[in-house]
Amino acid sequence: MLMPRRVQHRKQHRYRTKGIAWRGSTLAFGDYGIQALEPAWVTAQQIEAARRAITNAVRRGGKVWIRVFPDKPVTKKPAETRMGSGKGNPEYWMDVVKPGRILFELAGVREELALEALTRAIHKLPCRCRIVKRERPGEAAEEEAS
């Protein structure tokens, strides 16, 4: 499971997600990717489930890049606990995802297999996503000509 090795502060505020992602919104490594279309809190468990779905679909071929990292702790108080007495203990880790953020990238596999693998991974994520494909410089000109 993904989580930070060390953190400066064990507990953080739960802030509201505003705006769209400017950084991390384009494909940087692979040929295909998953892009978030709405804001979400993606937990470490959801990231791991999506990663497993991709690796199971592509088997040995291809390379997967995880472009998000769960660095925000989410605290929770025990059940049937009275109000007050401080903030709860960290329960799990998550990442705040803004619309437009690339979550996963994939390279080294056929297009049909990549679309199948990324579709499986999208079903594991808590927000609406779309599959994006890297545009090659010559591809757009070829499509317009035909």
UniProtKB/Swiss-Prot annotation:
<dbReference type="GO" id="GO:0000049">
    <property type="term" value="F:tRNA binding"/>
</dbReference>
<dbReference type="InterPro" id="IPR047873">
    <property type="entry name" value="Ribosomal_uL16"/>
</dbReference>
<comment type="subunit">
    <text>Part of the 50S ribosomal subunit.</text>
</comment>
<protein>
    <recommendedName>
        <fullName>Large ribosomal subunit protein uL16</fullName>
    </recommendedName>
</protein>
<keyword id="KW-0694">RNA-binding</keyword>
<dbReference type="InterPro" id="IPR036920">
    <property type="entry name" value="Ribosomal_uL16_sf"/>
</dbReference>
<keyword id="KW-0689">Ribosomal protein</keyword>
<dbReference type="InterPro" id="IPR020798">
    <property type="entry name" value="Ribosomal_uL16_CS"/>
</dbReference>
<dbReference type="GO" id="GO:0006412">
    <property type="term" value="P:translation"/>
</dbReference>
<keyword id="KW-0699">rRNA-binding</keyword>
<dbReference type="InterPro" id="IPR000114">
    <property type="entry name" value="Ribosomal_uL16_bact-type"/>
</dbReference>
<dbReference type="GO" id="GO:0022625">
    <property type="term" value="C:cytosolic large ribosomal subunit"/>
</dbReference>
<dbReference type="GO" id="GO:0003735">
    <property type="term" value="F:structural constituent of ribosome"/>
</dbReference>
<keyword id="KW-0820">tRNA-binding</keyword>
<comment type="similarity">
    <text>Belongs to the universal ribosomal protein uL16 family.</text>
</comment>
<dbReference type="GO" id="GO:0019843">
    <property type="term" value="F:rRNA binding"/>
</dbReference>
<dbReference type="Pfam" id="PF00252">
    <property type="entry name" value="Ribosomal_L16"/>
</dbReference>
<keyword id="KW-0687">Ribonucleoprotein</keyword>
<comment type="function">
    <text>Binds 23S rRNA and is also seen to make contacts with the A and possibly P site tRNAs.</text>
</comment>
<dbReference type="InterPro" id="IPR016180">
    <property type="entry name" value="Ribosomal_uL16_dom"/>
</dbReference>
